[in-house]
From Swiss-Prot:
Name recorded for this polypeptide: Putative F-box protein At2g02030
Record InterPro entries: F-box-assoc_interact_dom, F-box-like_dom_sf, F-box_dom, SCF_F-box_component
SUPFAM superfamilies with a match to the protein in the record: F-box domain (SSF81383)
Pfam families, per database record: F-box
Native organism: Arabidopsis thaliana
Top-rank lineage group of the source organism: Eukaryota
Biased composition regions of type Polar residues, renumbered to the chain: 1-13
Coiled coil regions in record: none
Region of interest: Disordered: 1-31
Alphabetized PANTHER family for the sequence: BNACNNG10540D PROTEIN, F-BOX PROTEIN CPR30-LIKE
Amino acid sequence: MSGKTSSRGQQDEISGEKHEPTPTKEIKRRRKEFEKIHIPNEIVEEILVRLPVKSLTRFQTVSKHWRTLITSKYFGKRHMALEKSKGCKLLFVCDDFVDRAEDTLFLKTVALEKTSVSEGDEQAFEFEGYKGFLDISESCDGLVCFYDTTRAVEVMNPATTMFIELPLSRIQQLCIYKPNPEVELEPVQDPNPVLDPVMTCSQIGVGKDSVSGSYKLVWMYNTSPATPPTCEVLDLDGKKWRFVNTTSLDHHQILCDQRPVFANGSLYWLTGDEEGYATTQTKLIVLDLHTEMFQVIQTPPFITRDASGDKIGLCNLDGRLCISELKKDCKQEF
């Protein structure tokens, strides 16, 4: 028998033992396997654009490239268009009836057409100072406003659970701090200053400038004594309230119980006579969000001459303005 010592490989072959590769070799092997997998950026984009917002929020941390893609305006427009094509979603808002928390609201989003990626989503949100009543605006591209006359407006996207708090508008300052001589409306910008914080028909509208793509909040309200309505506008990019001239709305006030509706780049309100009553032919106030100019137009012929605001409905139907009236025979005419 030879006195030479067998090599490690020969010993393993004789004994039948197998040794795991060293960590370095294992890393190199896995790296080579990963290098074999290549998904073109175009395919990655097509996959990502079909995912829900919550998943996209998480995937922003995967890489700088993914974050840049997901947060780009181009991707946002594609994702928004695809979401709209999937059908309508409903947002339900209710109080906390379980724990009786006065400052908590439950928000639940439900898709009308159930799919594997459109499950209902429920979130609980705390609103500091909330005591059981908040106004809620109509939605625009998923953005919703929660507000009242004595607390700051909060703009929320229920899909991402992100929100921003806006500065107080002038009418809110008057309602909170009156009498306060430091709070005065600018006579140059507003030819009809609010002398009395009593207001009616106050509802915030949310819309999108069809040219610049920026989102705007519009707060128009009737004031006492009777004047043309007062209008404040806030651009979400600048976050500053300012007045818009309403002299073209002389002898018109918005009807009660109406939320402004956004469609075709404009916001719409119903208007009656100088006192805000539908004693004359009900008409439509239209605000172009790009030019920020008002006009008053006729309602369709089927609308009753003295129909009250609670009988006429305005809504956005597939991006277009839809108007209807509940007739005396309880039939809805569109």
